[in-house]
Amino acid sequence: MDIIVLAGGLSTERDVSFKTGSMVASALKENGHRVILLDVFMGYSDKEENLDGIFDRADEISVKVDDIPEVAPDLAAVKASRKDQSPCFFGPNVIRMCQMADIVFMALHGENGENGKLQAAFDLLGVKYTGSDYLSSAIAMNKGMAKQLFLSLIHI
């Protein structure tokens, strides 16, 4: 399978996400899959017309985890280092690359990867992904609502 492991993003848990993503990507590669570890915020800045055969160049395209500091990220510095300087959640070519994959493995940590918004976008775009659907993610992220829902199920 051709798999995008989506990690990073603009979260205080950016570094943890890359560690998770790196381990997942390694395990998937060991099992014969073609895998790209992709930073959802930084994206891949090659021209869109050069995306053909991206999974043949997976090692070249993947985020180099050794370059990621093991300390809490300076999110202002991360924003400033994005080539296109866009504030958009998705970096260059992220959506297109995810659409080209057989599935996207969600290795994002923090609100933006777990609150259901990304899952809803992928549902609308027809992108297959791992984990909970958008509604389940949104409910689980709201701890008060999740607690009420679970307590109501006890009495059924």
Show the residue positions of the predicted features.
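ATP-binding N-terminal substructure of ATP-dependent carboxylate-amine bond-forming enzymes
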Residues: M1-L135, I139-S152
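Conserved small/polar residues in nucleotide/adenosyl-binding loops
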Residues: I154-I156
